[in-house]
Amino acid sequence: MKKPLLIIILFFIISCQNNFEKDVLNIVKSTEIPAVVMGKINKDGSMDFFSNGPSRWDRNDTINEKNIFSIASMTKALGSVAALQLVEQGKITLDEPLDEYLPNMSSIKILTQDNKIIDPINSITLRHLLTHTAGFGYWFTSKQLSDWGNLKKEIGWTENYEPRLFESGTSYMYGTNIDWVGRLVEKISGMNLEDYLRKYVTGPLEMNSTWFNVPEN
């Protein structure tokens, strides 16, 4: 199976441009990274970029800092900032149960290590979600979820969602926790998450080229 195109954007504070480009080329040659854009911020605030590789598998161009990139799980940082703003404003606390805010989340059943389905006992808090200790996983962080298509048939799972993998606060697993944080922000603020982030996070930071959906223009 072909590996997906992996594009990494890194910002380094490096004083020497020649060494900077040499370091980038060495990284590209020593790994399976097909394309990379790297930048450095100079002491005067200016930025220099170095690129290597195509913007897509089927193109003969060179990728650059003006290409559009999917930032994927870096949106977790934005969602976390939004939630912590609400904590600062006293609209939610880190440790109160979220059952009333997100009943659909709280009722998600747990799949044990021996593939038994049990009802959750502990409530989920914002702290659990932010620290990835609420029990949610990904297919690439959980062996059970990686084969979920087959496993759910074996155990007779009929729900249209994936189970949690442990009681909140009892373990750690990188997973879909921040998706629920985004829903919590919407619930408390009464705003669409994209609108909230634009008004209170990306807007004030002048991140004017960051969107949920790329504008037509």
Regions from the PLM with identified roles:
Residues Q85-N104, I188-E216:
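Short, well-structured active-site flanking segments
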Residues V37-K40, D48-F49, A72, H128-T131, ...:
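Structural recognition of the beta-strand scaffold that forms the well-ordered cores
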Residues P4-I14:
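Sec-dependent N-terminal signal peptides
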Residues G169-N177, S189, L193:
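Short, contiguous, pocket-lining structural segments
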Residues P54-M173:
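Active-site-proximal loop and beta-strand segments within enzyme catalytic domains
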Residues Q17-N18:
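Bacterial signal peptide processing site
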Residues L25-T62, L94, L145-W148:
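A short, well-structured edge-of-sheet supersecondary motif
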Residues L78-S80, N177-G182:
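Well-ordered alpha-helical segments within folded domains of soluble proteins
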